[in-house]
Amino acid sequence: MATHRLVMVRHGESSWNQENRFCGWFDAELSEKGAEEAKRGATAIKDAKIEFDICYTSVLKRAIRTLWTILDVTDQMWVPVVRTWRLNERHYGGLTGLNKAETAAKHGEEQVKIWRRSFDTPPPPMDEKHNYYASISKDRRYAGLKPEELPTCESLKDTIARALPFWNEEIAPKIKAGKRVLIAAHGNSLRGIVKHLEGMSDQAIMELNLPTGIPIVYELNQELKPTKPMRFLGDEETVRKAMEAVAAQGKAK
């Protein structure tokens, strides 16, 4: 029997998603399409009459703005928000800013596939000569991090390893205490939570790609285990496309 509800949403499409560039910790803005996705997701939450007691997001504006949109549309802008770097997207290191074609030309298609599809192989690190090194590594929002906490690149395994402690120490106790939680974050940090909730294998989580801007609802028991599969919120067509996209993730392209 479900005793708790958790809502998660991957941010709407960013300007760099639109350009097919590795974004990671670069603070890209939502694209026009992404802003519309956030509004559509917010409307779905409003229509479902879902209320929140506390919200969590990353320190990147594409996730924060998606959260703002949801709280605005649902008239819950007063609800407390916790921002943390631990919910940031995976750090794509030296690939940051490159599009797929440029990356394949520079490193070879086979190597790029390993970086994208492998659970525990990180991309090359972002060195001090990288165009975005200073704007990311020296940004004051990360001033409080210990040197060993500030990544220069991450695999999906690394991303999950820094997101899960925050889930275990901060979010899970709030849910168990009866708080209604919303998490607005990124594809890879949310994957880590989904993997943990559902006990998915490393391979299975690599094949799951959460759709942008569509709220995901979990009904959880007292041990925070799902009592039914994840559910998407939205109109029938939006939900159908989202489910098809997720179902197709593991198939050969």
UniProtKB/Swiss-Prot annotation:
CDD domains: HP_PGM_like (cd07067). It comes from the Eukaryota. Coiled coil: none annotated. PROSITE patterns: PG_MUTASE. Interconversion of 3- and 2-phosphoglycerate with 2,3-bisphosphoglycerate as the primer of the reaction. Can also catalyze the reaction of EC 5.4.2.4 (synthase), but with a reduced activity. Homodimer. Interacts with ENO1. PANTHER family: PHOSPHOGLYCERATE MUTASE. This is Phosphoglycerate mutase 2. It comes from Rattus norvegicus. The lineage of its organism: Eukaryota, Metazoa, Chordata, Craniata, Vertebrata. The gene is Pgam2.
